[in-house]
Regions:
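Short, conserved micro-motifs composed of acidic
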Residues: 36-38, 91, 101, 116-151
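Active-site palm subdomain of RNA-directed nucleic acid polymerases
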Residues: 56-86, 90
């Protein structure tokens, strides 16, 4: 299937032959070494080779047509081997059925191309700012309901079903506070040069990561974040009483 997609993508000639030879099971063999003893070689008959420079490109090519299987109002996004299917729900009865139909179309696509989804890792989050969200269950490929969660971590940001970032802010404050404790225990110098270097290289990136998305407007969250910075700056020579 992957070789067929390479041809569809116009990857031919010497490069196409080289990749085909790379994927050919006759040339792909692996062994396991345990305590200096090597097992016999066994052929690798399926899958995209992992741990190679070209593997991410081949994987993206493998799943490139997955998004075409769903309806136009459903979005499919992938990062590495994680895939998200998203749909805005306006008409609960019809839109939920459409989303389940789109999920089934993706399951069928996976069967056609020889891919497998790990149903144990399936998660469903309903982003619903109101008090009650639709209770329509969604099914995994084996017919079991997909596990529902109140939040998920997407590229390092906690997304909660109530459309707030309170959980993410709490996690950021906890992580940065622990890092500050480690810095204060590790570095005895409290000069501006040392401490501000530690702040900019180790701590600030944790506080600022994706802040354009989750930057709070409520005073309680702002106070939590400022308290972290204040706790650090009060240990810097000449900045003990810095006014925020």
């Amino acid at each position: 299937m992957l070789l067929h997609k390479l041809k569809e993508a116009k990857v031919t000639g010497k490069i196409g032959k080289w990749i085909a030879a790379f994927l050919n099971s006759d040339h792909r063999r692996q062994a396991v070494a345990v305590e200096g003893v090597m097992s016999s070689l066994s052929p690798v008959i399926s899958g995209v080779p992992q741990g190679t420079v070209i593997a991410p490109v081949l994987f993206l090519l493998m799943i490139s047509d997955m998004a075409r299987e769903v309806s136009s109002c459903t979005r499919v996004s992938s990062f590495v081997d994680d895939t998200q299917v998203k749909k805005g729900i306006k008409d609960v009865a019809n839109d939920c059925l459409t989303l389940q139909s789109d999920l089934q179309a993706i399951y069928d696509w996976a069967d056609d191309v020889g891919c497998q989804f790990n149903s144990k890792k399936f998660e469903c989050v309903r982003y619903w700012p109101g008090t009650e969200s639709p209770e329509q269950p969604y099914l995994s490929p084996d017919g079991t309901p997909i596990q529902e969660k109140s939040h998920l971590r997407d590229l390092g940001v906690e997304l909660s079903d109530d459309c707030s970032f309170n959980l993410h802010i709490e996690n950021v404050v906890t992580i940065v506070s622990k890092l500050i404790g480690w810095v204060l225990r590790t570095f005895r110098s409290r000069t501006k040069l040392v401490m501000l270097t530690c702040w900019s290289s180790l701590l600030q990136s944790r506080l600022d990561y994706c802040s354009q998305l989750w930057s709070p407007s409520d005073q309680a969250s702002i106070t939590k974040l400022e308290a972290v910075a204040r706790h650090f700056t009060c240990h810097i020579e000449g900045m003990e009483g810095k006014n925020y």
